[in-house]
C-alpha cells in the first residue's frame, strides 16, 4: 500500500477517486469531496489527450522517415498493425469511404494506448500525484465512463450522418418504419424496435469498454489493497499477463463494432 496510508477500504477507495476540476469554484478536487455537478475529470482528459498526442507524434514521425531499404523494427511493427487493421476493414466494410480505415486505425491504437495504462504499477502515478500535492489521480482513461461515452457518441454521430447521407432524411425515416416488418400495420412496432436498436449501439459500445477496463483496474486495486507487498506478485503477475489480452481485445472489439455500425449505415434502406 505504498503512497497511501490507512485501512484497506480507504486505500481501495482512494484509487477509485478522480482528480476533478470544479467549475463552480475553479479548483482541483477529489471526486470523494465533489458536491457540484459541474466538474471535469481532468486526469482522464489529460491522459487521453497525452496518449493521443503520443500516437500522432510516433505515427507522424514514422510516416516522414519510413523507408523501403532497411526498415526499423518499429516501422515493421506499425506496418503489421496497419496491414492487420486494413485487412479487417476490407472484410467488414464493403462501401466506398476512404475515412473508415484511418478512423479504425485511430480508434484501435488510441483505445489500446489508454487501456495499456492499466498495466502500470497501481501505486506509481498516485504516489507521484501525492508528491505534487494532488488530491487524487486515476490514469486509465478507458476506465472512465465519460471517456468511453464520448468515444461511442462520436461513433453514433458518424453512423447517423452516413445513414442520412446515403439514404436521405426520407429514406432514413422510411428505414425506421418499414424494417424489419415491411407492412404498414407494423410501422409503430418497427419504429420502436429500430429506435431502441439505434440508441442501444452507443450505450453498449461505451459500457462494454468501460465495464471491462474498470473491473480490470479494480482487480489490480483489490490485490494491492488486501495483500501484503510480498504476496501481491503471486496474483498480480498472472492477472497482468491475462490483462494484456483484455487490453488488446477490448480495443479490437470497439474498432470492429465501429466498422460494422458504419458499414450498416452505408447500406441503402
Swiss-Prot record:
PANTHER family: ATP SYNTHASE SUBUNIT A, CHLOROPLASTIC. It is found in: Cell inner membrane. It comes from the Bacteria. It comes from Blochmanniella pennsylvanica (strain BPEN). It is a multi-pass membrane protein. One of its GO terms (biological process) is proton motive force-driven plasma membrane ATP synthesis. Its main location: membrane. InterPro entries: ATP_syn_F0_a_bact/chloroplast, ATP_synth_F0_asu, ATP_synth_F0_asu_AS, F0_ATP_A_sf. GO terms for molecular function: proton-transporting ATP synthase activity, rotational mechanism. GO terms for cellular component: plasma membrane; proton-transporting ATP synthase complex. Key component of the proton channel; it plays a direct role in the translocation of protons across the membrane. The chain crosses the membrane at residues 39-59, 65-85, 108-128, 153-173, 187-207, 218-238, 240-260. Belongs to the ATPase A chain family. Disulfide bonds: none annotated. This is ATP synthase subunit a. F-type ATPases have 2 components, CF(1) - the catalytic core - and CF(0) - the membrane proton channel. CF(1) has five subunits: alpha(3), beta(3), gamma(1), delta(1), epsilon(1). CF(0) has three main subunits: a(1), b(2) and c(9-12). The alpha and beta chains form an alternating ring which encloses part of the gamma chain. CF(1) is attached to CF(0) by a central stalk formed by the gamma and epsilon chains, while a peripheral stalk is formed by the delta and b chains. Keywords: ATP synthesis, Cell inner membrane, Cell membrane, CF(0), Hydrogen ion transport, Ion transport, Membrane, Transmembrane, Transmembrane helix, Transport.
Amino acid at each position: 500500500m505504498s503512497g497511501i496510508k490507512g485501512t484497506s477500504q480507504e486505500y481501495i477507495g482512494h484509487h477509485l477517486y478522480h482528480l476533478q476540476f470544479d467549475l463552480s469554484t475553479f479548483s482541483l478536487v477529489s471526486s470523494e469531496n465533489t458536491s457540484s455537478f459541474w466538474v471535469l475529470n481532468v486526469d482522464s482528459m489529460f491522459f487521453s489527450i497525452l496518449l493521443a498526442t503520443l500516437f500522432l507524434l510516433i505515427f507522424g514521425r514514422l510516416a516522414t522517415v519510413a523507408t523501403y531499404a532497411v526498415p526499423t523494427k518499429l516501422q515493421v511493427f506499425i506496418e503489421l498493425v496497419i496491414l492487420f487493421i486494413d485487412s479487417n476493414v476490407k472484410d467488414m466494410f464493403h462501401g466506398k469511404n476512404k475515412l473508415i480505415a484511418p478512423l479504425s486505425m485511430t480508434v484501435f491504437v488510441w483505445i489500446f494506448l489508454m487501456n495499456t495504462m492499466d498495466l502500470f504499477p497501481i501505486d506509481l502515478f498516485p504516489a507521484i500525484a501525492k508528491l505534487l500535492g494532488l488530491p487524487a489521480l486515476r490514469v486509465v482513461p478507458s476506465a472512465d465512463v465519460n471517456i468511453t461515452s464520448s468515444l461511442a457518441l462520436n461513433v453514433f454521430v458518424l453512423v447517423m450522418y452516413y445513414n442520412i447521407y446515403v439514404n436521405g432524411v426520407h429514406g432514413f425515416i422510411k428505414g425506421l418504419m418499414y424494417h424489419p416488418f415491411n407492412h404498414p400495420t407494423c410501422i409503430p412496432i418497427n419504429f420502436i424496435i429500430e429506435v431502441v436498436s439505434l440508441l442501444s449501439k452507443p450505450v453498449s459500445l461505451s459500457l462494454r469498454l468501460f465495464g471491462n477496463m474498470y473491473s480490470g483496474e479494480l482487480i489490480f486495486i483489490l490485490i494491492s489493497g488486501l495483500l501484503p507487498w510480498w504476496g501481491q506478485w503471486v496474483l498480480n503477475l498472472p492477472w497482468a499477463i491475462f490483462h494484456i489480452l483484455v487490453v488488446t481485445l477490448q480495443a479490437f472489439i470497439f474498432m470492429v463494432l465501429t466498422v460494422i455500425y458504419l458499414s450498416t449505415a452505408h447500406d441503402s434502406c
